[in-house]
């Protein structure tokens, strides 16, 4: 059925940066078939589902390119620690207690939070109960890139078992749910996967035609320890083993790198998921996004898990990313307002290798959100792009659509039972802490 959303301010995020102050969009079979200024013709609207946006702002759905929704019960569980202690002393021991019910509760909680704050697409890097989650994503109507991450600090036999699990999941779910679910392979990090194991995973990814996702250079300690063991930075080792070329890489973090490393990643069309709030909370440092951009790296945004953030609000992430770069570089135009919005939308689509996504254009997937501009912090309302980056909040989002199907309308979730999910999340955490 044709759907028309009319009476909206349409922020297209196309290359021309077109904004229709009073416009409408037409959606058929999950894609945009028209984006126009003014009102739809009476003939065109005949037989269509016409939605009056009532002057809301309509923009592409936000895209979260790095996270661990399975950890969402751990929100606020352990603060004020660096990454290494946070993981070893708190998170990993808690993860040993996770079972299917707890992980399901965590993930459903995350999907509620993401939809309510305008995220339509996300990446999940985790190792537990992925098939159940893929089915839940399909039912909830979201778009996702999912992967069974692997840690290689084990025997070669166990390494191969983990890789086989990862490949099996990737094959089962790649391009499923009407193309809304894609998969990757995911060595956890250079410090948890020996070089030979990463090489084996990359070889498998090349054979399967799958991208690879990995944590990279998140903390200074990680890099110092790695160089003590291998005599070089992990990016240099990847290059020495010819693992950067012929592989679609998406790296998370990339905080502790130098110009030569950015140059290598840019030369091999790698993408980076910048997670500024998580990096700040854990005291990991500030990634040099401006240097990444200079070398042609596609920089997108991720939240990491709520255990280290503590929210999944990409508006907060966008704002933090732009402001940090201006502050550390003492330059007000080094990451522009438009570039900040791009990181949360079209660059996210590129990083996850989703075609026809991330902008409001004819032929693009109809993943979009609407915000209520009738908020004091969004007025005067003439500078919408500036407000979206520097003032908007996830709570301003009122409507969320994926492939033209509504997941939330007028702040009401349509595919998830929020009341039940919140109750279950609290019950599961209490059970784990007993």
Curated annotation (Swiss-Prot):
Keywords: Hydrolase, Metal-binding, Zinc. It comes from the Bacteria. It catalyses: S-adenosyl-L-homocysteine + H2O + H(+) = S-inosyl-L-homocysteine + NH4(+); S-methyl-5'-thioadenosine + H2O + H(+) = S-methyl-5'-thioinosine + NH4(+). The keyword Lipid biosynthesis does not apply. Binds 1 zinc ion per subunit. InterPro entries: Amidohydro-rel, Deaminase_MtaD/DadD, Metal-dep_hydrolase_composite, Metal_Hydrolase, MTA/SAH_deaminase. The keyword Metal-binding applies. Its EC number is 3.5.4.28, 3.5.4.31. Gene3D superfamilies: Metal-dependent hydrolases, Urease, subunit C, domain 1. Substrate binds at residues 95, 148, 188, 218, 304. Zn(2+) binds at residues 66, 68, 215, 304. Its cofactor is Zn(2+). It is an enzyme of class 3 (hydrolase). One of its GO terms (molecular function) is S-adenosylhomocysteine deaminase activity. Belongs to the metallo-dependent hydrolases superfamily. MTA/SAH deaminase family. HAMAP family: MTA_SAH_deamin (MF_01281). Catalyzes the deamination of 5-methylthioadenosine and S-adenosyl-L-homocysteine into 5-methylthioinosine and S-inosyl-L-homocysteine, respectively. Is also able to deaminate adenosine. This is 5-methylthioadenosine/S-adenosylhomocysteine deaminase. The lineage of its organism: Bacteria, Bacillati, Bacillota, Bacilli, Bacillales.
């Amino acid at each position: 059925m044709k759907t028309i959303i009319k009476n909206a301010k349409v922020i297209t995020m196309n290359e021309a940066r077109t904004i229709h102050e009073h416009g409408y969009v037409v959606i058929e079979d999950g894609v945009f078939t028209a984006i126009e200024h003014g009102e739809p013709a009476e003939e065109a609207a005949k037989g269509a589902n016409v939605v009056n946006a009532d002057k809301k702002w309509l923009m592409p759905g936000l895209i979260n390119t790095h996270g661990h929704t399975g950890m969402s019960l751990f929100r606020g569980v352990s603060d004020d620690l660096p990454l290494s202690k946070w993981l070893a002393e708190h998170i990993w021991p808690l993860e040993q207690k996770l079972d299917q019910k707890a992980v399901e509760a965590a993930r459903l909680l995350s999907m509620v939070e993401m939809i309510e704050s305008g995220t339509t697409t996300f990446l999940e890097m985790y190792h537990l109960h992925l098939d159940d989650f893929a089915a839940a994503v399909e039912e909830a109507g979201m778009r996702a890139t999912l992967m069974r991450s692997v840690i290689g600090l084990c025997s070669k036999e166990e390494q191969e078992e983990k890789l086989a699990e990862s490949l099996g999941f990737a094959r089962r779910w790649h391009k499923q749910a009407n193309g809304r679910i894609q998969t990757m392979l995911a060595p956890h990090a250079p410090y948890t996967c020996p070089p030979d194991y990463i090489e084996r995973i990359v070889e498998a990814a090349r054979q399967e035609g799958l991208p690879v996702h990995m944590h990279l250079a998140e903390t200074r300690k990680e890099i110092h320890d790695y160089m003590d063991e291998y005599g070089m930075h992990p990016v240099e080792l990847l290059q020495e083993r010819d693992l950067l070329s012929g592989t679609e890489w998406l790296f998370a973090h990339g905080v502790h790198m130098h110009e030569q490393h950015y140059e290598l990643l840019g030369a091999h069309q790698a993408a980076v998921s910048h997670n500024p709030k998580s990096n700040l909370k854990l005291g990991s440092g500030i990634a040099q996004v401006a240097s990444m951009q200079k070398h042609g790296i596609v920089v997108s945004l991720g939240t990491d898990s709520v255990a280290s953030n503590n929210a999944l609000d990409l508006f907060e992430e966008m704002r933090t990313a732009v402001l940090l770069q201006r502050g550390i570089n003492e330059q007000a135009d080094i990451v522009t307002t438009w570039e900040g919005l791009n990181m949360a939308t079209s660059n996210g689509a590129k990083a996850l290798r989703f075609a026809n996504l991330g902008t409001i254009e004819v032929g693009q997937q109809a993943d979009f959100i609407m915000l209520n501009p009738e908020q004091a912090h969004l007025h005067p309302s003439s500078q919408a792009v500036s407000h979206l980056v520097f003032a908007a909040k996830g709570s301003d989002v009122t409507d969320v659509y994926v492939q033209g199907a509504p997941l939330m309308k007028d702040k009401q979730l349509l595919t998830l039972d929020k009341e039940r999910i919140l109750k279950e999340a609290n019950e599961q955490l209490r059970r784990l802490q007993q």
